[in-house]
Amino acid sequence: MVLAELGGRIMSAIQKMNNVTIIDEKALNDCLNEITRALLQSDVSFPLVKEMQTNIKKIVNLEDLAAGHNKRRIIEQAIFSELCKMLDPGKSAFAPKKAKPSVVMFVGLQGEVLEKPQLVPSMLIIIRRKGYKPALVCADTFRAGAFDQLKQNATKSKIPYYGSYTGSDPVKIAVEGVDRFKKENCDLIIVDTSGRHKQQASLFEEMRQISEATKPDLVIFVMDSSIGQTAFEQARAFKQTVAVGAVIITKMDGHAKGGGTLSAVAATKSPVIFIGTGEHMDEFEVFDAKPFVSRLLGNGDMSGFVNKLQEVVPKDQQPELLEMLSHGKFTLRIMYDQFQNMLNMGPLKEVFSMLPGMRAEMMPEGHEKESQAKIKRYMTMMDSMTNEELDSSNPKVFNESRIMRIARGSGRIVREVMEMLEEYKRLTTMWGKVKGLKNLEKGNMSALSKNKNSQQLSKVLPAQMLKQIGGMSGLQSLMKQMGSGKDLMGMFGGRDE
C-alpha cells in the first residue's frame, strides 16, 4: 500500500465514523481498527501501531467527555497528533552556523547514500540558497564509480570536492578532506560514506571509525521509503553505531509502501529534515511533519502552498497581483503569468496535494503530464497573441479571424484555441467572484483573513472543498496562515543564525 493509499484508507475510516449517528466505544474501536490494519499493511511496525492506538484511547476517553464536546473533532485531532508524533520525535536537528565549519556525515543502506541522482545537487541548491559555503568529501571507497559520481555532481553545482582514485582507506580520505576544507573556510562540509547493511560488521566498524576521526556535528541517515518491514531494525542498527541526528527519505513518490519510513524514524528518534518525492531537483523538499500529515489526510497545506507561490512570484509583483485580485481584473496575460508560476512551483501532483480537500492520488497516474502539456499548449497559443489581446479583459475581442490567426501562429487547430478561450472565460468568472476584497491593494496578505474577505473567497471554493476545510471558520484559519508570513524552518530543523 503506497503512502497516498494509506492516507485514503485513514480518511475513509474517519469518514465512516463521522457518518455514525452516535459516537460510542464501538464507533471509536471500528475506526481505530481500520486505521491499524491500514498502517500494518503499509509496513509500519506492530509495536508502533499498538502504541499509537493506546495513546489515542488515552486522549479520547468518551466517558469523561462532557456533553456538548465535539467527539468527532477530538478523535480526528488525536489521530492527526499521533501520526505527526510518528514522524516527529519532538527534537530539533543540529542547525549549522555560517562562517563556522560544520561537518555533516551521510550514512545509509547500500544503494541509497547519495546514489540517487537528485539528492546531492538538490540538497546543495537548498544549502547555497541559505548562504552557506558547502564542500563535498567522498569517503566511499567501496562502491565503484562513487568518486566519479560525486565529482560530476559537485562540478555541475560548482561545489568544491575532495576524493581519491588511488586511496583505499576511507578514514584517511575523510580526515584529509575535512581538514582541507576547514582551512579553506568552508562552513558546511559533507562527508559521503559507503552504503551498508546491518549484517556487514566490517562496514559498520568503518563507519564508526570515520565518525570518530572526523567528529561530525550531524550524522544524517538516508533511507529509501520502499525498504519495507526491515526499516526498523536497519535504522536501529545505524543509531546504535553512530549518533544519527537527522533523517532524509528518498523515493516518496507514491510507488513504495512507505510505512517502513514511519518505523525507521521511530527507531532513530531523529527528525526527518528532507524528503525526495521524485527523480528531479524540484522534487526534493524541506520536510515538516504537520503539513505532510495534513496533506496525507487530504486537509492540504496552505502555508506551504503560499510559500511555494511566494518563491515563484517576484516580491515586486505580489502587491500588483493582489490589487488586480481585489478589482476582479483578469486578463490573458495574468492567466499566462499564473500558468508559468504553476509550472515553476514544481510537480502539479505535489501542488495539488497542498490544496484542502485534495490528495495527490486524486490526480490519476499519467494525468499530471497531460495537464502540464495542456498548460504549455495554452501558453504557446498565447505567445501568438498581440499585446492588445493579452491585456484585454473582454473575451468578445476574439472574433473568427483572430482565432484562426492564433491557431496558425501557434501550430494548433481552431478547436484547441476555442478550448483555451473557454478555460479563460471560466477563470474570468471565478476571478470575478472575489471582486471587492478589501485592503489588498498594498499587498497586505493578512487582510485575507478578514471576515468579509473570507466570505467573498468562500463563494469561489467548491462546496465539498469548503466542507473539507471546516466551513467558514476553517477558511478564516487558513487565510490567517496565508497572511502570517511564517518563516520556513531552518536548514536542519533549526533557524538560520
Swiss-Prot record:
GO-annotated biological processes: SRP-dependent cotranslational protein targeting to membrane
SUPFAM superfamilies xref list: Domain of the SRP/SRP receptor G-proteins (SSF47364), P-loop containing nucleoside triphosphate hydrolases (SSF52540), Signal peptide-binding domain (SSF47446)
Positions with a binding annotation for GTP: 108-117, 192-196, 250-253
Main location: cytoplasm
EC number of the protein: 3.6.5.4
Domain notes: The NG domain, also named G domain, is a special guanosine triphosphatase (GTPase) domain, which binds GTP and forms a guanosine 5'-triphosphate (GTP)-dependent complex with a homologous NG domain in the SRP receptor subunit SRPRA. The two NG domains undergo cooperative rearrangements upon their assembly, which culminate in the reciprocal activation of the GTPase activity of one another. SRP receptor compaction upon binding with cargo-loaded SRP and GTPase rearrangement drive SRP-mediated cotranslational protein translocation into the ER. The M domain binds the 7SL RNA in presence of SRP19 and binds the signal sequence of presecretory proteins.
Quaternary structure note: Component of a signal recognition particle (SRP) complex that consists of a 7SL RNA molecule of 300 nucleotides and six protein subunits: SRP72, SRP68, SRP54, SRP19, SRP14 and SRP9.
Name of the molecule in the record: Signal recognition particle subunit SRP54 2
Gene (UniProt): SRP-54B
